[in-house]
Amino acid sequence: MQINFSKMHGLGNDFMVVDCVTQNVFFSPAAIRRLADRHRGIGFDQLLVVEPPYDPETDFHYRIFNADGSEVEQCGNGARCFARFVWMKGLTNKYQVAVSTKAGKMLLKLENDNQVTVNMGVPEFEPSKIPFRAKQTEKTYIMRVGERTIFCGTVSMGNPHCVTVVDDLELTDVDTLGPLIESHERFPERVNAGFMQVVSRNEVKLRVYERGAGETQACGSGACAAVAVGYLQGLLDENVKVSLPGGDLHISWAGEGKSLYMTGPVAHVFDGQIVL
């Protein structure tokens, strides 16, 4: 079966995006892994699938699959690409699009200069809803990871995140700590591991080891999680620039009970066809 797709990225976090509104396509985990292979397939961090709305109050349903074939609840960089894709492909003429995901609903707004703002919803700190094994909600948790003890914050942005504040991001062994945190027993559904260096109350540096994908050039939901945790711990103000290896995102959050907003760029790389 031949399918049409687009290759897109948000700050180097790259995606294969497929319109399943006008195409009838089923992706098995094995097929996704083949397509994600950077030597034998298309190559991507995540596959994004555009489906007809499940809910009459939304415009589309948004599905996300990691390179290992697992389906996940959320992808912030992908959401920005999703908004640009449906407009670019003529699936909508709206500049503000409502979508449902495995985690809930989101509002995506096309801005000028290929920027998209995403209402990421209200950060969730209740351990059972992340999910994270803890007796009660804390701003900071102590965890044993391998031979080390870390101090971290946990939050769900529709998907689970663990954020550790570090003194120097360049000296942080993300390749070792990332997978240990991702598969830590206190996270029954695994977790995205973020490592944040606070530059000022309005700027941080961040690296993210993503669940099922490894370290990526950028992680939108990870940037949101880092700011939410940093704000809750009293380290950050309401508006923060998050510098990732792939570029910058701008996050705005007014505190608990409020929706968090992410703004960042989108790039369309190419369109293609492939036999599935």
UniProtKB/Swiss-Prot annotation:
Its main location: cytoplasm. Keywords: Amino-acid biosynthesis, Cytoplasm, Isomerase, Lysine biosynthesis. Substrate binds at N13, Q46, N66, G76, N77, N159, N192, E210, R211, G220, S221. GO terms for molecular function: diaminopimelate epimerase activity. GO terms for biological process: lysine biosynthetic process via diaminopimelate. One of its GO terms (cellular component) is cytosol. The keyword Acyltransferase does not apply. Pfam families: DAP_epimerase. The active site is at C75, C219. It is an enzyme of class 5 (isomerase). The record marks H161, E210 as: Could be important to modulate the pK values of the two catalytic cysteine residues. PANTHER family: DIAMINOPIMELATE EPIMERASE, DIAMINOPIMELATE EPIMERASE, CHLOROPLASTIC. Homodimer. Belongs to the diaminopimelate epimerase family. This is Diaminopimelate epimerase. It comes from Photobacterium profundum (strain SS9). The gene is dapF.
